Amino acid sequence: MAEKRNIFLVGPMGAGKSTIGRHLAQMLHLEFHDSDQEIEQRTGADIAWVFDVEGEEGFRRREAQVIADLSEKQGIVLATGGGSVQSKDIRNHLSARGIVVYLETTIDKQVARTQRDKRRPLLQVDDPREVLESLAEIRNPLYEEIADVIVKTDDQSAKIVANQIIEKLGF
């Protein structure tokens, strides 16, 4: 890998973007960033608080700025927020600045992986499965639209998925 390329991980909540991203960055000797963690660092508050105080629109504005800033770097792996692809500007930005990897998973896996996580504001409802299904209907076509590579994450360890990504990218 002569030039430092950016790798952007997109996909739904619970697909494993952050965990897989850390492994991938380590294996490729790249810097790892997580857009949600970066928002928390910049605001000094957790994502749930940002949602409560600024609403989803305020959160999405912050997310767009963080992704724009981080994607200016060279040689990073960036785990994006699941809803970031709903912004056409962000989709264009990611496509232009690096390789987009869609981490695909089933609704069942999403439910299993997120059921105890109280830090996901959109899932703090009576029926999180219904929310995940609704989000998938909107977002999955957008993930597919910008993906250079699609990798399924069901029933595989983060390390195995990271290796599959490296193999598919030819690194």
Curated annotation (Swiss-Prot):
Q: Which reaction does it catalyse?
A: shikimate + ATP = 3-phosphoshikimate + ADP + H(+)
Task: Show the GO cellular component annotation of the record.
Answer: cytosol
* CDD domains hit by this protein: SK
Question: What InterPro entries does this protein map onto?
Answer: P-loop_NTPase, Shikimate/glucono_kinase, Shikimate_kinase/TSH1, Shikimate_kinase_CS
Which residues participate in substrate binding?
Answer: 36, 60, 82, 139
Q: Where in the cell is it found?
A: Cytoplasm
Keywords annotated in UniProt: Amino-acid biosynthesis, Aromatic amino acid biosynthesis, ATP-binding, Cytoplasm, Kinase, Magnesium, Metal-binding, Nucleotide-binding, Transferase
Question: Which amino acid positions bind ATP, per UniProt?
Answer: 14-19, 120, 156
Pfam families (alphabetical):
SKI
User: Would I find Metal-binding among this entry's keywords?
Assistant: yes
Per the UniProt entry, the disulfide pairs are none
* Protein name from the UniProt record: Shikimate kinase
**Which gene specifies this protein's sequence?**
aroK
